Amino acid sequence: MRAEIENYIKKIEQSLDLIWRSLDIEALTVRLTELEELTADPNLWNNNANAQTLLREKNNLEEKLNVFNKLKSNLKEILELEAMAEVENDLETLNQIEQDFKKLSIITAKFETECLFSGETDCNNCFLEINAGAGGTESHDWASIMMRMYLRFAERLGFKTKIINMINGEEVGIKSCTIRIIGKRAYGWFKTESGVHRLVRISPFNAAGKRMTSFASSWIYPEIDDDIAITIEDKDLRIDTFRSSGAGGQHVNTTDSAVRITHIPTNTVTQCQSDRSQHKNKAQAMKMLQAKLYKLEMQKRNENVDKQNANKTDNSWGHQIRSYVLQPYQIVKDLRTNYETSDTKGVLDGNLEDFVSASLSMNNSGNKT
């Protein structure tokens, strides 16, 4: 038991040290004092836009500092309880303390990753698109496995999800889907997952038991706040309505409630069929279009648009971000960071935190996603 406790303590202390350096707590505290003085100025609201910017920054820094101090305080309290339990040889309390250290280790590691979030939309909700590659049944099944993986990942992080659009495969799985992920910092946690995913396994659909390779792609873009202006001209839009093709009961296919919107200049397409109301589906599809166009604009600014669009559209060997090998051995490897694990079951069950952390650490050198 003592060895496990020591291991958790070491992990927590290492995370807190990395957080201290990542946030630069001393500089953060100085900046927070400056912001408190600026936001106390009675003339602050003479410039509404500037006031909103300063308040957002102040609230963000206050939250980070409060979380850091609370983690330190929690560690101190548990260490004090552990010392008393050790003196009294209270095994029951020590068992509970071990679980407390485990929980604190998980929370601290999560906050350590969130300290790497630096984009202006990292705190927002986001949309996740999954598209099966060529290969019919195999890729459709792989796309559905990916959908489950990301739904479980969102659940692990405490996010809510809503399937906006889904097209089923002819035999199994899905051809494509769009999922709205709802929760604070959802985009920050998902943004590095855009790209092509390759699966190697013994096919359950091949009578000869051959090893097969399948591809599917994911693309993540942030939901846009009202204070971010995205101009879309009506003349640039083509709006089509159609009957829903997904599951949902007898009412789904009785009216043309599903909506597809095409932004003609960029050939960007969104569609929604999650509601029986055409009006609500149109509003959701328009919100998704705004988010996609914002993402494309950010990519252009970062001079990554060609690479990102390739990742989004070309489900092939040359644009992979991750490989999932289930036979003849088991390994999941990220081809950008070289991070890998043999826990394929855990990964496919949504355990993606370490992959995200590795990608964010690499991107933190200055690349934005």
Curated annotation (Swiss-Prot):
Its main location: cytoplasm. GO terms for molecular function: translation release factor activity, codon specific. Keywords: Cytoplasm, Methylation, Protein biosynthesis. The modification N5-methylglutamine is found at Q250. It comes from the Bacteria. It is found in: Cytoplasm. InterPro entries: PCRF, Pep_chain_release_fac_I, Pep_chain_release_fac_I_sf, PrfB. Methylated by PrmC. Methylation increases the termination efficiency of RF2. NCBIfam families: prfB. This is Peptide chain release factor 2. It comes from Rickettsia prowazekii (strain Madrid E).
